[in-house]
A protein has these predicted regions:
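Active-site helix/loop of acyl-thioester processing domains in fatty-acid/polyketide metabolism
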Residues: 33-56
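HotDog/MaoC-like acyl-thioester-processing domains
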Residues: 1-13, 71-80, 88-183
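Small beta-barrel nucleic-acid-binding modules, principally OB-folds
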Residues: 59-74
């Protein structure tokens, strides 16, 4: 993997894999990666002025609607890691999307890529609610990120964090029937 992050101008949050992050398989448990992404999202949001205290004050918060994570390589206890995150979409009303790239700081190997979709919710009811105007302004993606994403699409590059939906094997079909389908 390249030593560069996938997109320009990432917000970089640094984490270290601890002994208690390691599971019975001897590597960092996949649920820990999700915790690190959440920490990075909060750190980035706070840097943009959308702190937890601000969210509580206006009774609105961005909550996870859907997560797509591609685990590419394991992390181990003692690894110094960098979580790059970017705002890649905002409709200015309800939805914000973030991309993430987790890499080992030493060799810059990418361990995970993710796309997480958020919706703005009323903190009292938990129901979707239009985001405040300041959220819309603060969560707007950077122009250079939008341009890089457009360049990727123009070259026919799919970002690669959205795995193809697994196809269910229909009743009576065998795995071989499905595996041979070029879909």
């Amino acid at each position: 993997m390249s030593g560069d992050f996938d997109l320009p101008s990432p917000y970089v949050h640094r984490v270290a894999a601890a002994d208690f992050d390691v599971d019975a398989y001897g590597h960092v448990n996949n649920s820990v990666y999700l915790r690190w992404l959440d920490e990075a999202a909060w750190a980035h949001s706070s840097a943009l002025g959308v702190t937890p205290q601000h969210c509580v004050g206006v009774r609105r918060g961005m909550v996870v609607w859907r997560s797509q994570l591609h685990y590419l390589a394991p992390a181990f206890a003692g690894d110094a890691l960098e979580v790059g995150t970017w705002l890649v979409f905002s409709d200015g009303r309800l939805r914000v999307d973030r991309r993430f790239q987790l890499r080992r700081a030493g060799d810059r190997r990418t361990l995970l890529r993710a796309l997480i979709h958020y919706v703005c919710a009323d903190l009292d009811s938990g129901r979707p609610k239009r985001m405040p105007a300041d959220y819309a302004a603060r969560y707007a993606p950077l122009a250079e990120v939008v341009n890089a994403l457009a360049d990727d699409r123009n070259r026919g590059f799919a970002p690669g964090v959205e795995p193809r939906e697994p196809r269910a094997i229909s009743r009576g079909a065998t795995a071989r029937d499905d595996a041979g389908d070029p879909r």
